[in-house]
Amino acid sequence: MSVGSYTKLSADGGMITLQPSAVHIQALQDLAKVLPKAAANAQRRAINKTLGWLMTRIARAVGSQEQIAISAVRQRLRSYPVAGGGMSGKLWFGINAIEARRIGPPRKTGQGVSVKGRRYRGAFLGKVYGSKKDIWIRKASKHFSADDYPDSELTSARGPRSGWIAEHSDRHPLAKAKVSLEQARPHFDHWVKQADQQLLVVLRQELNFEIQKYLKGNARV
């Protein structure tokens, strides 16, 4: 018997597996005895709808907590709906630090760059590596803080390698502004509990839909 939904965390994110628990299976049993295909369809739709609900819930919660654009959080979410005869769906949330330019429109100021209420003093907005403008600061700047530039990578004239980013040579190391999403890590268990509760609500709705469809079909016979 299924143990219900659960989450598995790793260094760079968390995978939420959404699947029926004993409570959900109990709700399915009566219909499954009479209309097994209808019960399976109801379960599949309920899980997939709950995955969509959970994705929106997480995006809004993290966006509000970290003061970043919901669209930026959504880019870190990957949904894997129920397929075929499967009984579970999955939702991946990557929590590696996100580039500051992605959380909202960056704006140059007299003291540096600001984005969504975050101020990066001494920083500048420009293309250092790649085609996108990012927020950068020289490592030697008095305004540099490792907290504002987590998980930075280094690219030199010879190509990328781990470490700091070099603008034109290794003599001028630059750090890219990023926003840590590590604060989301403790919330995965809470999200799983919410998803389990929502799954039961949606499952009952889908079961009722299948029952009504069956009754209407019989009434026309």
Pin down the residues of each PLM region.
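Short, Lys/Arg-rich flexible segments
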Residues: 2-221
